């Protein structure tokens, strides 16, 4: 299938309007052309600096503009971040994402951020950060420290964007994505469904993502988590089939990207999640929280994977992490595979 960067809103709406079964069938066909089937990549997300964000994103409980139950916390110590990363690896995550509630990182924070990146990389995990807007120099610094992915969502269509955020422009977001790409990092960028946007806006979001010069390597699709105290706490729920349709169309439009089920998965039953995987989702966040919102427990995810026959992407194991029992097993295997005396010599008496 041709990878395109010239989609129109009309084309995307036509896909969204297809019969549900036909759309899922097409999305699954596209998915299997570009990705291992029955395979999901697992990430863990940690809030390394929580609350008191100067931005006015109407969906976000971390905004200083709204009264929510989120407490203000300073930038987390490097040791605590690395401890959380090790626990994430032990639980099966292959990527560790670190998020800070900032408009943009300050230069005084860059040394600590780079230390976090290097420490997580040393564990054999992929690294991702979401810190707000970046300058070209900051993007270069993070890339040189070894950051693999940078997350910066577009959130919604350009037309609906002003109804949700006024403290940074849509172009600000696109500029940050450009700086990230120029620095050689991979892009994680998606949006949020259920903020009161129209079908046109949902189509417009996917058009913006798919028409970037290079598709994002990871496309998180979030279902709004309504939080008391935010302006969007009373919006209508997303129709589950509409959400699954969006996953399917994202897969068709960006066939080589990972499509991630992100915020809102806690509200999805197993059947809805299964449909999302059928539609082409092949990545999830794993663990108890996504920044400040709940996420399904690890045990429930593993049970669902078992029911569906889904395999997790495995963490690359470093030589010094091989356990004594694993080493013994390997020795036994090698000894068993060695030729015996009867294999090497014939018995002249026979």
UniProtKB/Swiss-Prot annotation:
Transmembrane segments: none annotated. [2Fe-2S] cluster binds at residues 97, 128, 188, 260. The lineage of its organism: Bacteria, Pseudomonadati, Pseudomonadota, Gammaproteobacteria, Vibrionales. Homodimer. SMART domains: BATS (SM00876), Elp3 (SM00729). Keywords: 2Fe-2S, 4Fe-4S, Biotin biosynthesis, Iron, Iron-sulfur, Metal-binding, S-adenosyl-L-methionine, Transferase. Its cofactor is [4Fe-4S] cluster; [2Fe-2S] cluster. The gene is bioB. Residues 38-256 form the Radical SAM core domain. PROSITE patterns: RADICAL_SAM. Gene3D superfamilies: Aldolase class I (3.20.20.70). This is Biotin synthase. [4Fe-4S] cluster binds at residues 53, 57, 60. InterPro entries: Aldolase_TIM, BATS_dom, Biotin_synth/BioAB, Biotin_synthase, Elp3/MiaA/NifB-like_rSAM, rSAM. One of its GO terms (molecular function) is 2 iron, 2 sulfur cluster binding.
């Amino acid at each position: 299938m041709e990878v395109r960067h010239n989609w129109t809103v009309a084309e995307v709406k036509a896909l969204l309007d297809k019969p549900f079964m036909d759309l899922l069938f097409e999305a699954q066909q596209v998915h299997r052309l570009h990705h291992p089937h029955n395979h999901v990549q697992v990430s863990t997300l940690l809030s390394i600096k929580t609350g008191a964000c100067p931005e006015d994103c109407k969906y976000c409980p971390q905004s200083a503009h709204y009264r929510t139950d989120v407490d203000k916390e300073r930038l987390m110590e490097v040791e605590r971040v690395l401890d959380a990363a090790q626990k994430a690896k032990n639980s099966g995550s292959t990527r560790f994402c670190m998020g800070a509630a900032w408009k943009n990182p300050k230069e005084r924070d860059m040394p600590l951020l780079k230390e976090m990146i290097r420490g997580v990389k040393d564990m054999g995990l992929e690294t991702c950060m979401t810190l707000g807007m970046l300058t070209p120099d900051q993007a270069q610094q993070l890339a040189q420290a070894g950051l693999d992915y940078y997350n910066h969502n577009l959130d919604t269509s350009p037309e609906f964007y002003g109804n949700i955020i006024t403290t940074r422009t849509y172009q600000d977001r696109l500029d940050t994505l450009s700086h990230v790409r120029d620095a050689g990092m991979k892009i994680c960028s998606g949006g949020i469904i259920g903020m009161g946007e129209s079908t046109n806006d949902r189509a417009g979001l996917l058009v913006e993502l798919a028409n970037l010069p290079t598709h994002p390597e990871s496309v998180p699709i979030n279902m709004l988590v309504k939080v008391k105290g935010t302006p969007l706490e009373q919006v209508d729920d997303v129709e589950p089939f509409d959400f699954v349709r969006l996953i399917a169309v994202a897969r068709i439009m960006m066939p080589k990207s990972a499509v991630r089920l992100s915020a809102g998965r806690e509200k999805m039953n197993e059947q809805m999640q299964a449909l999302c995987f059928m539609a082409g989702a092949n990545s999830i966040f794993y663990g108890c929280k996504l920044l400040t919102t709940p996420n399904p427990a690890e045990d429930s995810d593993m049970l669902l994977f078992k029911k569906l026959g889904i395999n997790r992407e495995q963490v690359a194991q470093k030589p010094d992490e091989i356990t004594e029992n694993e080493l013994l097993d390997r020795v036994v295997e090698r000894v068993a595979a060695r030729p015996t005396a009867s294999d090497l010599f014939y018995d002249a008496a026979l």
